[in-house]
Curated annotation (Swiss-Prot):
Gene Ontology molecular functions: indole-3-glycerol-phosphate synthase activity; phosphoribosylanthranilate isomerase activity
Protein name (database record): Indole-3-glycerol phosphate synthase
Gene: trpC
Species for this entry: Rhodopseudomonas palustris (strain HaA2)
Pathway per the UniProt entry: Amino-acid biosynthesis; L-tryptophan biosynthesis; L-tryptophan from chorismate: step 4/5
Catalytically driven reaction(s): 1-(2-carboxyphenylamino)-1-deoxy-D-ribulose 5-phosphate + H(+) = (1S,2R)-1-C-(indol-3-yl)glycerol 3-phosphate + CO2 + H2O
Length: 265
């Protein structure tokens, strides 16, 4: 595992332990069970495909470890509304604070402002975080195969499905893809950013896409900035994309989102 992921895992496990002390899982689970039902994340993506459109998972991200501050004028509800107006199918909201300046409060606020399903974008190491995600309204969670062993990934996926959520399985090489295909989720995200080096190349998606069964929903993640990038990934069968930084840097996010999708259609 990389130095970056090792550092992230260390602080995440400390965060989880502190959260468990502050709020036992039984109390949190009551909130999760009482929350309004999840909005179908995979269903929303497939509805776009059925209409002949690309499906965009639009990301709300204030900062990142590799780029620092991405957007100073950061208003999650307004950004969510801009993405919805621009034609996004779903939202992705960063909730990790140390590396991304994210927050569960941003997830709650963004989701409340729109009708789109929302992914809790975070480093998941414990089923407690899954319950926490649902209690805060998340419709989908992320499993990063590079961060977990098979048993951990299965436990987290099972917990999410038990709460009615969808799961995005993230891979960035053949070994991780083979492991992800043993899980139940139909949604496989190919991260073009190597989490061990933080280098980005669309060639990762081009290499892995042909190995993903046609009944799975492929998601291209990271390094997507232009309609040409979308078209390049579409040539290997991808029609769902997770885009954050390039849209977060735009003054008019709704117009930029619309332009990205329209010019690529």
């Amino acid at each position: 595992m990389s130095d970056i992921l090792t550092k992230i895992e260390a602080y995440k496990r400390e965060e989880i332990a502190a959260a468990k002390r502050e709020r036992p899982i039984a109390s949190l689970e009551a909130d999760a069970r009482a929350a309004p039902p999840p909005r179908g994340f995979v269903r929303a993506l497939r509805a776009k495909h059925a209409a002949g459109d690309y499906a965009l998972i639009a990301e709300i991200k204030k900062a990142s470890p590799s780029k620092g501050l991405i957007r100073a004028d950061f208003d999650p509800p307004a950004l969510a509304q801009a993405y919805e107006q621009g034609g996004a199918a779903c939202l992705s909201v960063l909730t990790d604070t140390p590396s991304f300046q994210g927050s569960l409060d941003y997830l709650v606020a963004a989701r409340a402002a729109v009708s789109l399903p929302a992914l809790r974008k975070d480093f998941m190491y414990d089923t407690y975080q899954v319950v926490e995600a649902r209690a805060h309204g998340a419709d989908c969670i992320l499993i990063i195969m590079a961060a977990l062993d098979d048993a951990e990934a299965r436990d987290i996926e099972d917990a999410a499905f038990d709460l009615g959520m969808d799961v995005l399985l993230e891979v960035h090489d053949r070994a991780e893809l083979d492991r992800a295909l043993q899980l139940r989720s139909p949604m496989i995200g190919v991260n073009n950013r190597n989490l061990r080096t933080f280098e980005v190349t669309l060639a990762t998606s081009e290499a892995l896409a042909p190995l993903i069964p046609k009944d799975r929903l492929m998601v291209g993640e990271s390094g997507i900035f232009t309609p040409d990038d979308l078209a390049r990934l579409a040539r290997v069968g991808m029609s769902t994309f997770l885009v954050g930084e390039s849209l977060m840097r735009q003054e008019d996010v709704a117009t930029a989102t619309r332009a990205l999708l329209a010019r690529a259609a």
